Amino acid sequence: MDGNDNVTLLFAPLLRDNYTLAPNASSLGPGTDLALAPASSAGPGPGLSLGPGPSFGFSPGPTPTPEPTTSGLAGGAASHGPSPFPRPWAPHALPFWDTPLNHGLNVFVGAALCITMLGLGCTVDVNHFGAHVRRPVGALLAALCQFGLLPLLAFLLALAFKLDEVAAVAVLLCGCCPGGNLSNLMSLLVDGDMNLSIIMTISSTLLALVLMPLCLWIYSWAWINTPIVQLLPLGTVTLTLCSTLIPIGLGVFIRYKYSRVADYIVKVSLWSLLVTLVVLFIMTGTMLGPELLASIPAAVYVIAIFMPLAGYASGYGLATLFHLPPNCKRTVCLETGSQNVQLCTAILKLAFPPQFIGSMYMFPLLYALFQSAEAGIFVLIYKMYGSEMLHKRDPLDEDEDTDISYKKLKEEEMADTSYGTVKAENIIMMETAQTSL
């Protein structure tokens, strides 16, 4: 009996399975066909034999003893034409986690994560990093937003919509992830504080080494009696996060030594966001198929729409509470709602058994779709209305300048030039004094 196609009880409802009668005829176990082989012909009495093919036959014997059949599609021992009974189970196909497409997808997800983290490291300027370490406002905001607001929001949404344990773990994992490069791009488009955006993204990524497994452990207690939470691979999650430090460190080194190359890598990593999402949607949809995609509950789609929107709103409210300037409010808003979906996808793909996650592997992709669409709407509204209102100023005199340092510099220059001014009357008086001497 081949056990390669066996799946766990949790994932069994999503897959078709075949069963075969065991040789001792006392237990029904998983297998590749359904067979009652013909017994020996010792003694009178008919014995019914059903083979996997489209036929049936009778063989003599007082007490039929079932044996494993070796017949193929040809039927039983005494085939007499096609059987009037339809075959209840078709030959079992490979599960999606054993297909070559899934193995290729694993490689693609790992490569996309490395490119993203390399680009993230290339945004770090070592000369400016020390100032943020001495005044860690950005790091504190990142910790509060990414590991305070978002995990709590994901936990409350999972409880409110009564998600099962698999969907709840996928939502929690996405909510506990750090910020991604999308927030840096969107902050640039809304004239945000880029230094704050970069330091929040970097800080949340580094803090995720400790806080992400901690948040998963805290908020998963609501489903502690379920198999997937009992087998929650916190060590593998931490190891995956640690592996992201290598491309980040390489990116910091490239920025320090070769700044022009770092600028090129940042552009490539930003454009790779779009390519990664498109390829992941196509490959995952092809691999899972319509049956598994249809098994995603409607509540998961609602959470994927509402969760980034609530993250943007809570981030803006937190920045308002701290009385930050408008450009910093927009930055914190985008940093809170934008998650590193490449990291979330990689953890779901590489750390969890695929038979446990199933179609919930699609949740971070759905989240990425809606977080990008909602952030794009926010940028569009800002470009149409917000930029004009924020840059509107009162009419000033021609000589009036709002830059205090520049005004002071002009006053000093005017004072310096007055010291060197020589008038014609003074020249005549000096010449008269010299001739009298």
Swiss-Prot record:
Bias (Low complexity): 51-60
Glycan-modified residues: N6, N18, N24, N181, N195
Tissues where this protein is expressed: Highly expressed in brain and small intestine, and moderately expressed in colon, heart, prostate, and testis. Very low levels were detected in kidney, liver, ovary, placenta, spleen, and thymus.
Site note Cleavage, residues: R87, P88
Location of the protein in the cell: Cell membrane
A GO MF label: bile acid:sodium symporter activity
Membrane topology reported for the UniProt record: Multi-pass membrane protein
GO BP annotation list: bile acid and bile salt transport
Topological domains annotated Extracellular: 1-103, 162-197, 255-267, 313-360
Keywords in alphabetical order: Cell membrane, Glycoprotein, Ion transport, Membrane, Sodium, Sodium transport, Symport, Transmembrane, Transmembrane helix, Transport
The record's account of how the chain is modified after translation: Activated following N-terminal proteolytic cleavage by thrombin and/or proteases.
Any one GO CC term of the record: plasma membrane
InterPro entries per UniProt: BilAc:Na_symport/Acr3, Bilac:Na_transpt, Na+/solute_symporter_sf
Location of the region described as Disordered in the Swiss-Prot/TrEMBL record: 37-82
TM segment ranges: 104-124, 141-161, 198-218, 234-254, 268-288, 292-312, 361-381
Domain of life: Eukaryota
Cysteine pairings via disulfide bonds: none
Cytoplasmic face residues: 125-140, 219-233, 289-291, 382-437
Role this protein plays: Transporter for bile acids.
Family statement drawn from the similarity comment of this UniProt entry: Belongs to the bile acid:sodium symporter (BASS) (TC 2.A.28) family.
Protein name: Sodium/bile acid cotransporter 4
Organism: Homo sapiens
Name of encoding gene: SLC10A4
